[in-house]
């Protein structure tokens, strides 16, 4: 019998022989020798290895489906003993090679989805672009600031809460055979920043008692002070602001949907006898911790009520909060860019969304002095983009870098109405248009199927060196009909540029036609364009001549999981461009001064 001990690196080799090689060298056996791979008792094997070793009559050893055994390495350091029960002594070297091949094979779990067992496993982070993920739960959304971190934060461990000796007894007797619940409270979402993780008690499992659950709610910015709040934190006095909601959360945590405050109140009275809680006399729904716990997370009441003050303050990069989003808040956030004193810096350099964009089309043929000073979105082709820090009260979604923008065409509906009315011979030939893109509201869904509305907190646009140029031209196939074609190859969107919308800008919703025009490269055509608001006075007409108009283009793309891709087009319509189409206003941009 020959024994070979080889580590996973293949450097250590120990041989021992039982002295029967010379006696049985000339003898031939009909059975094939068996190669047995068994773990050494002292070694700790985390992955199982499997292979087939074939031994033919001519004493040639082969590994089935293994061509390059020596080139595949594993990261685990295990020791495996390969015992060969054979009568052929001269096959020892081949047996050791077979044992080494077994040690260098990939785990069956890694080879399950691959036909070739010798393919080197590439980690997902090598070929996958960088992603940012923000957990969303619509049931715990509050009005707070949004920040996203891509770093894995350490779990927050705190010292055990000092209680009386009787506090470790369970609140209720456990049922026989029922496992203790290991899930966290529903408001924590598994995030290390929301709630604190207690050190496990010896012999008590991971059961969360009611007083611990209330303490977690007091330390959660999603529930404090919305459902429960401190009245005197130094003395440990707190109040149940919404006792029904707290009892529902406790019932959801205990998997009891019929939980109410009356049932939970009986459990609270149990803590009176144990010396954990006390009822504050003369005040309803007010309780007090007998021994105030140490190292608790303090939630500021003003922090969750005023969002705008939060945006001006310095926040931690690893904090994650939920927000609610409405159409009015989106329009206010987009229009607050031009007033730098109202917007505070929030750096989201890795968040982008390419499927929903705002395209800004402006005609730089006019002089800069003739434009309104409020329309800072109108950027000429020679102007370099500036960095914009937008304080948008919206969550951040997951996306990748380097999104593309496609070709879009704006076509006038009336065939006889001219699209371009030239005011100068220079702009009549080929005026150029600058395109900018920013993300807009886009519907999405969570893991549990709840549909929510998300908004990226970064403005994306084209760099100054890669600005797409548009030609205001007349199609040859459409008689008397003008169109705006965004020509050129798709460009990657990576830079930042200031974008704002003027006061009183109408927001339009336009529908995409189901069938495109025939041709080799037919552009997408908007079925309608907008017209400036009705003129009330000469001063208003002069101001609105340079205002930025907004179009919203809805396009269905069922190829990507039936997602709706929304394009919002911001058009600057000076006197050089006439848009003679009636509009349907869905909302107006309001600017706070």
UniProtKB/Swiss-Prot annotation:
Tissue occurrence: Expressed in all fetal and adult tissues examined. Among fetal tissues, highest levels of expression detected in heart, lung, liver and kidney, and lower levels in brain. Among adult tissues, highest levels of expression detected in heart, placenta, lung, skeletal muscle, spleen, thymus, testis and ovary. Moderate expression in prostate, small intestine, kidney, liver and pancreas, and weak expression in colon, brain and peripheral blood lymphocytes.
Keywords from the named record: Activator, DNA-binding, Isopeptide bond, Methylation, Nucleus, Phosphoprotein, Transcription, Transcription regulation, Ubl conjugation
GO cellular component: chromatin; cytosol; nuclear body; nucleoplasm; nucleus
Crosslink site: Glycyl lysine isopeptide (Lys-Gly) (interchain with G-Cter in SUMO2): 536
Example GO molecular function: DNA-binding transcription factor activity
Modification sites for Omega-N-methylarginine: 494
GO biological process: cell differentiation; negative regulation of DNA-templated transcription; positive regulation of DNA-templated transcription; regulation of transcription by RNA polymerase II
Chief site of localization: nucleus
Protein role: Isoform 1 transcriptionally activates the LYN and BLK promoters and acts synergistically with RUNX1 to transactivate the BLK promoter.
Family, similarity comment: Belongs to the ETS family.
Subunit structure: Interacts with the LIM domains of LMO2. Interacts via its N-terminal region with RUNX1.
Protein name (database record): ETS-related transcription factor Elf-2
């Amino acid at each position: 019998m020959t024994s070979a001990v080889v580590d996973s690196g293949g450097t250590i080799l120990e041989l021992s022989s039982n002295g029967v090689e010379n006696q049985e060298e000339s003898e031939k056996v009909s059975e094939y020798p068996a190669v047995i791979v068994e773990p050494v008792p002292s070694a700790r094997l985390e992955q199982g290895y499997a292979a087939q070793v074939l031994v033919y009559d001519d004493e040639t050893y082969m590994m089935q489906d293994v061509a390059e055994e020596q080139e595949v390495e594993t990261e685990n350091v295990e020791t495996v003993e390969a015992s060969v029960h054979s009568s052929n002594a001269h096959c020892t070297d081949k047996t050791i090679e077979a044992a080494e091949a077994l040690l260098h094979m990939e785990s069956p779990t890694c080879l399950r989805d691959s036909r070739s067992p010798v393919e080197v496993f590439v980690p997902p982070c090598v070929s996958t672009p960088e992603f940012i993920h923000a957990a969303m739960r619509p049931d715990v959304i509050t009005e707070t600031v949004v920040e996203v971190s891509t770093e894995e934060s350490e779990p927050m461990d705190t010292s055990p809460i000092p209680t009386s000796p009787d506090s470790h007894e369970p609140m209720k007797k456990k049922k026989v055979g029922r496992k203790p619940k290991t899930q966290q409270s529903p408001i924590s979402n598994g995030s290390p920043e929301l709630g604190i993780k207690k050190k496990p008690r010896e012999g008590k499992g991971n059961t969360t008692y009611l007083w611990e659950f209330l303490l977690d709610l007091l330390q959660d910015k999603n529930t404090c002070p919305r459902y429960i709040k401190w009245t005197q934190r130094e003395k440990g006095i707190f109040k149940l602001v919404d006792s029904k909601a707290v009892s529902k959360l406790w019932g959801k945590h205990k998997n009891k949907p019929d939980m109410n405050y009356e049932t939970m109140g009986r459990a609270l009275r149990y803590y009176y006898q144990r010396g954990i809680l006390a009822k504050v006399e003369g005040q309803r729904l007010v309780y007090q911790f007998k021994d105030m716990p140490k190292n608790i997370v303090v939630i500021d009441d003003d922090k969750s009520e005023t969002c705008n003050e939060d945006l001006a303050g310095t926040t931690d990069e690893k904090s994650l909060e939920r927000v609610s989003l409405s159409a009015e808040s989106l329009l206010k956030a987009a229009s607050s860019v031009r007033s730098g004193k109202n917007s505070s810096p929030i750096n989201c350099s890795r968040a982008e969304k390419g499927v929903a964009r705002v395209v800004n089309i402006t005609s730089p043929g006019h002089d800069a002095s003739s434009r309104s000073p409020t329309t800072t979105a109108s950027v000429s082709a020679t102007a370099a983009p500036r960095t914009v820090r937008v304080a948008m009260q919206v969550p951040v979604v997951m996306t990748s870098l380097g999104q593309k923008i496609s070709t879009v065409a704006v076509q006038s509906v009336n065939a006889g109405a001219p699209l371009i009315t030239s005011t100068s011979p220079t702009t009549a030939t080929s005026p150029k248009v600058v395109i900018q893109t920013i993300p807009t509201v886009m519907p999405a869904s969570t893991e549990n199927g709840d549909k929510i509305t998300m908004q990226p907190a970064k403005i994306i646009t084209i760099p100054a060196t890669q600005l797409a140029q548009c030609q205001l031209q007349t199609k040859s196939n459409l008689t008397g009909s003008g169109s705006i074609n965004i020509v050129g190859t798709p460009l990657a969107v990576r830079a930042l540029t200031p974008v704002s919308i003027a006061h009183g800008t109408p927001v339009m919703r336009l529908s995409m036609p189901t069938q495109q025009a025939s041709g080799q490269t037919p552009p997408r055509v908007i079925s309608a364009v907008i017209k400036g608001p009705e003129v009330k006075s000469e001063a208003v007409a002069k101001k609105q001549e340079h205002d930025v108009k907004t179009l919203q283009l809805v396009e269905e793309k069922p190829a990507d999981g039936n997602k709706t891709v929304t394009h919002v087009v911001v058009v600057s319509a000076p006197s050089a461009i006439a848009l003679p189409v009636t509009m349907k206003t869905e909302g107006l941009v309001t600017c706070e001064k």
